[in-house]
Amino acid sequence: MKTLLAALLALASAGAVSAQVKIAVINTQKALLETDEIKKAQRDLEAKFKPRQDQMVKLQKDLQDIQTQLNSGKLNEVGTQELQTEGQRKQRELQRDQQDLQEDVERERTDILQRAGSRMQDAVKKLAEEKGLDIVVDTVNTVFYKPAFDITADATAAYNKAYPVGTGSK
């Protein structure tokens, strides 16, 4: 916000305000998340990690079954002890698997978003040049704007055109 204010003040002090300044706003996050590449990457991530998620669902069911058996009161002391040990082992395994999965998903998601974010900046810069814009501000830093100044959909379309899915966009 301070950078925008400084830029506007610099333009004003240079007398450039009399020459119409063209400003647009963009919701960069929304534009990025709506690209075909990000949508495909999300589907690919879900498919890639589904077997691990399914395994964790199975472990959770196993833990529920163990708890049901323990609550039944039909086990002797040795059986109860063995089942409790098995339950603790499965609980630790589940926690490790959940943490590993979360870290793996987050790492891949971060890589995808960083690459796509850089591409989005390039697409927005090119779009701004095509539209003759002087300043493009993210809506995160904007208190108010008229919808006519929003180029979010245009940026998504420009990104999809520049980086079509399925043509080596990775």
Task: State each model region's role.
Residues K2, A6-A14:
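Bacterial N-terminal signal peptides
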Residues G15-A19:
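Sec/Tat signal peptide C-region and signal peptidase I cleavage site
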Residues Q20-T142, A162-K170:
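Amphipathic alpha-helical segments
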